[in-house]
Amino acid sequence: MKVTYFLEVTSSWCFWSEPMWAELKARYAGRVAFDWEIAKMLPGDWPVSRAQCDWFYRRSGTIVRSPFMLNSGWFEPVKPGTYPAASYVAEAAKDFGFTGDEIRLALSHAGEREGQKIGRLEVAVAIAAQAGGKKLPAKKLRAAAESKAVAARIDASTQEFFAHQISQRPAFVLSDDIGDKAVFSGLVHLEPLTAAIDAMLADVAAYTSFKSHHGNPPAR
């Protein structure tokens, strides 16, 4: 069974979902494969001012009962035809073996807790390189983040996100090898996902048990 997490590094709702993501990975370690992919936000999804960004942060922070408010200091207007760098840098870090959460979490924390300008490539690269240490050299990371290969991967994962007929991040797509699929879009609470995962794991186990007793279906 696999769970794919679709995210945008600078999304406040993705920030709030991270404790739940970590809990899922710990709870189902060894039984479920976990992966994350970038789902780019559309131009109209971004706040148009720091004041508007703060308004969104007050709303999401209140809903999750956070004891702190996120920092909008990272905010800069998104120019037409451009995209904030943080997600590209996080994706590029995969080329250096950083397929876990550590690099994108470092970027998210730097932006949304410290207000660093993670939309700027040089800032995002510096943060990621520091988090990755010697295994993540800044010059090579920047080249990868600016490469056509990374852009193509992000475009492909974004298209996959929209192919599920969803629009809200975070999104979680649960799939298994018996063809079941469950899609959650915009949720940051643990219980709905654990209920679905438990049900799907039970079904997979049942199919395995049946096959061990009866084998494959008759050809005719």
Q: Where are the predicted features?
A:
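Short, cysteine/histidine-rich loop/knuckle motifs that typically chelate Zn2+
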Residues: 13
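Extreme N-terminal starter segment of soluble prokaryotic enzymes
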Residues: 1-4
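C-terminal cap of thioredoxin/glutaredoxin-like
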Residues: 6, 10, 18-26, 109-220
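Structural alpha/beta surface segment adjacent to cysteine/selenocysteine redox centers
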Residues: 16-114, 211-217
